[in-house]
Every structure is written in C-alpha cells, then in structure tokens.
Amino acid sequence: MSAAKENPCRKFQANIFNKSKCQNCFKPRESHLLNDEDLTQAKPIYGGWLLLAPDGTDFDNPVHRSRKWQRRFFILYEHGLLRYALDEMPTTLPQGTINMNQCTDVVDGEARTGQKFSLCILTPDKEHFIRAETKEIISGWLEMLMVYPRTNKQNQKKKRKVEPPTPQEPGPAKMAVTSSSGGSSGSSSSIPSAEKVPTTKSTLWQEEMRAKDQPDGTSLSPAQSPSQSQPPAACTPREPGLESKEDESTISGDRVDGGRKVRVESGYFSLEKAKQDLRAEEQLPPLLSPPSPSTPHSRRSQVIEKFEALDIEKAEHMETNMLILTTPSSDTRQGRSERRAIPRKRDFASEAPTAPLSDACPLSPHRRAKSLDRRSTESSMTPDLLNFKKGWLTKQYEDGQWKKHWFVLADQSLRYYRDSVAEEAADLDGEINLSTCYDVTEYPVQRNYGFQIHTKEGEFTLSAMTSGIRRNWIQTIMKHVLPASAPDVTSSLPEGKNKSTSFETCSRSTEKQEAEPGEPDPEQKKSRARERRREGRSKTFDWAEFRPIQQALAQERASAVGSSDSGDPGCLEAEPGELERERARRREERRKRFGMLDTIDGPGMEDTALRMDIDRSPGLLGTPDLKTQNVHVEIEQRWHQVETTPLREEKQVPIAPLHLSLEDRSERLSTHELTSLLEKELEQSQKEASDLLEQNRLLQDQLRVALGREQSAREGYVLQATCERGFAAMEETHQKKIEDLQRQHQRELEKLREEKDRLLAEETAATISAIEAMKNAHREEMERELEKSQRSQISSINSDIEALRRQYLEELQSVQRELEVLSEQYSQKCLENAHLAQALEAERQALRQCQRENQELNAHNQELNNRLAAEITRLRTLLTGDGGGESTGLPLTQGKDAYELEVLLRVKESEIQYLKQEISSLKDELQTALRDKKYASDKYKDIYTELSIAKAKADCDISRLKEQLKAATEALGEKSPEGTTVSGYDIMKSKSNPDFLKKDRSCVTRQLRNIRSKSVIEQVSWDN
C-alpha cells in the first residue's frame, strides 16, 4: 500500500470481479484523478449567459460596487466543473473554471453585491459572484448548483462508511461503474467506450425482446456480483430505457449477501451501471414493484410510445442550433441509456424549477434536485438562452451613416442603446419591432459582416465584428421570431411542465390498465407476426405509422396548454396525478368516440327470443354495420388529415413575392379557420351520433321489455297477440330510427366531403393565382431590369465617348499652346542668333582692322630696324674711319656724336619695346575674339539642335493627335474633317523676325557653314 501511495494509479481499469474497483490499485473509480481526456469527453448538463463580477472586486468598498460586470457564457459539466467563456462556441477556450466539487455553499448575493438575481459561490480559494437578468434564470442556476454543496456535506458525513477521501472529488453527475463489456473495454480512458454508444431504436427492441424472454423477472444474470445489484425501488417500477426517480435519490444502505457486507455506494455514484446491473434490475422479483399486466401487447405499446417520444426528441434536436447545450438521446452514453434510454421531452423546457412529475410516489425537492441528467435535457432549450441576447452591433441609417449601438434582444423587439450604462438607465436610442419580422439574411456591406432584418415596416441593416457573432445573432433572432421552434416562456409554469412530461413519466401500471377499445385479439396479432416473419421483417416496424400518433399527442398537448391558460388560476396548483388522470380520461373519451362507431354495444342478452329475433333479421343490421365501418374509415382519414396538417406556418416557404404575403397569410388564416370550423362540426356530428346511439340503446331496452312482456304473456298475464303487435311496432320504430340516423350521417359525410373538395379547390385556385401573379411580377421585373440595364449601358457609353472627346480636345488645345510657346521661344532664339551673328561680324571686322594695323606696324618696325641698322653701320664706319685719320684733331666732336647716337639708340629701343608690347596686346585681343567666336558658334549649334528636336516632337504629337481625333470622330459616326489645319500657327511665320524666319532652312545652314569655314580659315592664317 505504501508503494501505491508513492506511485498513485493514474488510469482506472475495471477489475473483472468487481468493476467498481481498479485492477491495478484496487481503489474505487472516484479516487483516480480526472485527466484531460475525461474533461474533453464530459457532457455539459447546464449552461447559459450570466454576468460575472470581476476578479478582486470588494463589494464592501463603494467604489468597487460600480464596476461593470462581465457577460460570459457559463457551462456546467457532469464532472462538476463550471466553466465560462466569451461566447457559446465549443471551440472557444474558457476564461476560467470553478470546481463545484470543492464548493462549500451557494448563497444569495444580493445583500453583498446590491444587485438583484445574484449568487455567491463559496469555495476554499475565493468567492465567485454571478448575476442573471431574470429571476427564473437565477432560480434554475441555484437549483443546479445547490446540489454540489449538499453532496459535499453528505460526503463529509459518510467518510466513515466509504473509501478514504480522494484528491479530487467527482461531481454528482459523475458515474461510478464503467465498461459494460469487460475490463479491457475501459482501459483506453477513464470514461469507458461502451458508454459512448448512442441510444438507438434497436436497443429498445432488444430490451423488449429481453423482457419477453424473461417475463417473470426472477432470474439473475450469472455474471452479476452481489455488489452490483441495486436496492429495490420504493414506489415506481423499473422500466427498460426509462429513468426512475430512485436513480436520483441517495442510496445509503448496506446489503448482506452470503454473509459478506458490501461497500455502500452513494447515490450520485450509482447513476450508471453496466448491462449486467441493468439485467439484475429488470429481473428482480415482482414483489418489488406494483403488480401490472405484462402481456406482449402492453410491452409492445410501451415500446411504441417510447419510440414516439424518441422521434419527437430527435426531430426537436434537429431544429435547435445550440451546439453546446443540446445533449439529445443520440449522444447519451450507453451506460446511462441502459437505465434511462429516453430523455424527457423538451417541448416546454425552461430554467424555472420544475414541478414534481406525475409518478406513483413524488419525491422531495431535495432528492429531485439531484437528477442532473434530467436537467441536462430540460435545459437544452431554455427561453432565456434563445430569446435574450446582448452585444455591440453597428447600425446603418437612411443617410448611409454607420453608428455603433448596444443591442438588447428581449420580448418582441430589438432595442438599441448608446451603451450598457444607457441600457441600465433605460435611455433608449431606438427599437426594431420583431413582431412583423419574417426573415433575417446575410447582407454584404463594406463595414465588417452585415445582415438585414426584414420586417413589414422595412429592412434594417446591421453589422457585426466577426462572422461568428453575425451567425449567432441571425440564429437567435430567427429562433426568437419563430414561435414553433423557440419555446414559450409561459411553459415554465409547473402545469406546463407536468403536461409536457406526463406521457413519459406516467407509471407503467396506469398505462397498462387503460382500456383500449377496438384492440385486436391475440389470434389476429399472432397472424400478423407470422406474416411479418414470412416477409422477413419479424423485428421491424413501420415508423411512418407513429407520426400521426405523435402529432396527435402534440396537438393534445397544445390544446391542454391552451385550456390551462384560459382557465382559472387554481388550475396551476393541480396535482400531477389529477392532470394525468384528466389526460387519460380525454384519451379514453376519444377512443370511445371511435369505438362506438365500430360496434353497437349493449348489455349481454341471454334471452333466446331476442337472439332469435336478431338472427331473424340479418339484412336489417348488416347494412348499418357496413355503413358504420365506412363512416369509421372516413373519420379515421379525417383525423389523419387533421393530425398531419402542418402546424408550423413559419416552416412553409412563401411562393409569392413580398407584396403578396399579406393576401396569402389572410387566405391561409381563413383556411385554418375553416379547418377549425370543420373540426367543430365533426365533433358535433360525433356527439349527435353518440346521442343517436344512446337512443338506439334505449330502444333496445324497450325491445327487451317487450320481449319480457311476451314471456309474461306466455305465462298467461298478457295476450300473445298484444305482445307481437308491440314488438312489431317497436321493431319498426327502431328500424326507422336507424335509417334516419344513417341518412343523416350520410348527409353529413357528403357535406363534409363537399366542404373538403371546395376548400381544396379554393386552395388550389389561390395557389395557381399566386403562382401566376408571381410569374407576371417576375416577368415585368425582368423586363424593367433589362430596360434599365440597357439604358444604363447606353448612357455610360455616351458619357464615356463624350468624356474621351473632351479629353482629346483638351489635349489638343494643350499641345497647340505648347507649340505656340515653342514657336515664341524659337523666334527669340533666332533673334538672339541674328544679334550674335551681327556681333560676330563686327568682331571680325575689328579683327581684320587690327590685323591690318599690325601689318602696318610690322612694316614700320622693319623699316625702323633697317634704318637703325644702316645708321649703326654708318656710325661704325665713321668711328673706325675717322678714328685713324682724325683721332688727334677732333676728339671732342666724336665724343659728342657717340653720345647722341647712344641716346638715339636708347630711344629707338624703347620704341621697339613699346611696339612689341602693343603687338602682344593685339594678339591677346585676337585670341579673345576667336574664343568669343567659337563660343557663339557652339551656342548657336546647341540652340539650333534643340529647336530641331522640339519641332520634330511637335510634329509627332500633332500627327498622333490627328489620328486620335480621327478615330474618335469615326467612333462617334461623324465624318472626319479633311484638309483642315489643326494648328493655326506656322512656325516659319514669326512676327518678331519675319524676314529672318522666311529663309529656307538650307540657306541658313549654308550661311552658318560659310561663316564657320571663314572663321576657321582666318584662325589658321593668323596662327601661321
């Protein structure tokens, strides 16, 4: 044991000898911790929208009391965990979890929070505060949650009797026994796979056949252990596939079998057993249950009623779209379905506390509250969950503006406020009346995910943040506006609850002891069974036969609800047994009404004279029997027609357009009124028939008295002839009465048949006229749409062509303006070039003048140089010649001449230097002029190139625009203008310099070429 404590067994595997113990550690199932697989496989048993107080809220602090409560979707699972998330989608991760197995108490929180309809869930860790919108919702949650603290307190008291406490106590809805097929089947998970098999119709037939094989119910299964058997029920009999009240109570006794004391099982651990336990319960001795007939026909009728309830359950499950809360019979596990195969109906489910069901021994509310699986089916369709929703949506107004509002769906309207604070202050911004809503569709909008609410007043466009929110709103509004699929809030009354569940919860003895007129004898049933065996369908059944019965039950429930609503308030406090007896009485009256048409019943007549008299006139009574049979067939057909009439108008698809919906609705209403009138006439006819049958019975009594008189006459008291005359008169009167009754009945049948044909003809004519009107409207609408589309296409084409033409004209004008600007620039450039050419010519002339002056200066300089050289040579000769001859005589004269010559030489040298400087300056000026000339020629070339490129580009643009204009003109069907000049400006006709611009381009080029060649030649000559 110490090793087991150190290494706890994490996986429960059932022991083959005791399936409530683990084969590894031999500890009970509840001592094993729940793993993730158990949590994911757990079934939700209750759920709904509630308001949760934020964490850390201290309601003793006035500041915290003004905090906003968070709206969350709460789900209570069968393992005792209460989880809450942002929405009701099953894929949404929960924001938090409250372990109800550790809950110590659930108390009213209004005193602490100051909020109505609030609860406080006390756990050892913290306190959780929840709040609902209405009293019914919070009462339902209180009833569901109070089970856990009570159970936890009971477990504390029973610690001496049961196993040691476990690390995690399972919830009251957690099962205690697993794996109905053996130990290996439960080894894969803590919740056995055998329990995952859904309840099907085949299991009901197997239970019926098993009950037939063991009618006495005294033998026990050999595989059953004493610890697996259940204590006997206190008051109610055990039924296969039907949950009894004893399953909800706490079993706390010790059973001794064979001198061994068996471990006591708590009530919430014994909710589910294996098939062997079920067989043990079914095979308990009859003294444990009240005596009731166990004929095969009664068993068959019970199974048929179970199948009808199962069909209704599945049909209603298909109509609901709540994926989390719906736990239909197809999803219940097989371990539970063996004890309770058919959940209670959810026709009038609500969150209000349910009244005690009609049973043989009604249990206390404390014991009834422990039926968590019963609440799992009743809470799957609650009025508050379907007909109440809040959230942020965006509404589109008539001017196209979008505005965000806080929407609240309640009653027959969709109200919207500025925010939730405005809702609490009743500051209403607007309201959408849903009483006339007939459809809610998705609508594509530019903002988020849109949908439209279609009403007679108009269409309202809303948008949600996500597609999931939009889908939830559409489903909620559709269920809200369709009263057949959404349950009525008034059904939360105890009377409605009793009426909705009376067919399933009535005891077996009451149903078996009801008289069923017209029931076939055992020989007929045997022959039918033989026929089915010959046809290969010994265990099959035609389920289409149950639909009229099931619809009749639904009609009876609706009529019962209507009568209870119109009755006095004292009817609400009626006992369940009285309601069940009232329902059985109505069912019996209806059967009698049909049974009286089958057989003309009367007291047993042992008088041989009467039998002789009836045998003497078989022809008189044979025809009435045949006619009454025909009448019975006709009435059965009429009832079948009434029962199969669809009662849910919202499920019918309208075939007429919107403007015909009012007429069709009025026609449909008139049809239903006529149907109700016909039903009333039929009931009146049936009453008259019963009165006539009563008269017939009185006549038969008179006939019996007459026969008695005849017998007395034989004894000598009355003459025989008098008796014979009285008997003949009585027989004639009786025959006339029967004939009158038959004729009256035939007339009524003819009248009903004619009325039916007339109604069918009117309905057919109305349908045909509606279809024709719809076709005509559709045809006219199509023609209007085609004309509108053609007109829009033509107008769009014309507007496109006109816009294209305007665009072309604008482009053409812009190009013309650009050409004018370019021509002006070209003229200015030409003027500048002319001025530059003139300046260049002046510079050339100045250069030539300078060159001539330079040449003259060079010649003068040469002449001076020659003269200087000659003078120097002369002086030298004079000096040399005179020096030899006159050196002695003229020294002073020679010195003077030499001085003069030196001075003259210096003067000449200075002149030469001045001339050289002037020549160099002239050379510099010439080089400067040559550079200016080169710069001017280069600039002229660049300007000319730019103007040529601009002119070529302008020519290309003009040609392209001409082509585009021509194409546009051809597209418009107009004749293109020929020979028209697009550009009214000639680039060669410039006003600024007309003489210069009129020259040919070749002449200008030639002149420029000559000027360039001349300048080059001069430059070369100058350099040389």
UniProtKB/Swiss-Prot annotation:
Protein name: Myosin phosphatase Rho-interacting protein
Region (Interaction with RHOA): 545-823
Record gene name: Mprip
Residue ranges with Basic and acidic residues bias: 240-262, 333-349, 522-545
SMART domains according to UniProt: PH
Subcellular location, principal: cytoplasm
Record Gene3D superfamilies: Pleckstrin-homology domain (PH domain)/Phosphotyrosine-binding domain (PTB)
A cellular-component GO term for this protein: cytoskeleton
Residues with PTM Phosphoserine: 193, 219, 221, 225, 227, 266, 270, 289, 292, 364, 492, 617, 799, 976, 992, 1013, 1015
Organism: Mus musculus (Mouse)
